[in-house]
């Protein structure tokens, strides 16, 4: 079974064929509610396309994506393939000790 897991502040969110989209943002209507003020109300979403999962960023300050073994990439109003495992930081780089981040893994 093709699944994708996002972990944020002790909560786990699973994506698969039945749940192909995870909305991210400070807005309480989002499935994953981000606490950091640097995140946008509707920051973005993770969506399943075929066997792949993409982060679609719609934020003001961007998302900083670190995939295993690769340098961090800043994404703003763009999308990026989330392969393997890694980390998404909302509105600031993972180099910032105050960064608010979620970990992801393609299962």
Listing of model-derived features with the role each one plays in the protein:
Residues 5, 14, 23, 33, ...:
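General beta-strand recognition
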Residues 19-50, 95:
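Short, charged beta-strand/loop "edge" motif centered at a coil->beta-strand transition
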Residues 2-8:
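A short beta-strand micro-motif
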